């Protein structure tokens, strides 16, 4: 995941790596042993009473300086050209497209019966349900990763609700309420499926 990447048109990607909180010693130890490329930096989220992913993303947002804000989870394995595709797609989309959602699937579908169930669920969701919602013009409830926003749109809709643990679906509906569309990106990010009950 921490491979040096750049977008199309010669524009560098600035990636902000955020541990869940200052007390996240496991992530801090892993990052201490990792040499980050120049375009990546670590933003440590201070401890607080609310300890959610959306709170951490809201905290990190002011440190991001790009026109496009993307979200990846630590275990994600996006294809090497995914960021290129995001830039090209946003350049070709009208301004009312505020977000691109990549497909998600798993790199360990054969780990257990449970992981196979998750794989079938994601395949159905990203290959059938979301395209059907898009074709009908209905709001797209976003996945929490491999999702990319125009920065100005994200700011306009109020970014993430720090108290909502389904912040991704909430933000997808809020984008629609503000008149923005979500388009689906033909690119699949693999992540780890739960394999133990």
Task: Identify the residue ranges that each predicted region occupies.
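Catalytic donor-sugar/metal-binding loop of nucleotide-sugar-dependent glycosyltransferases
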Residues: 172-190
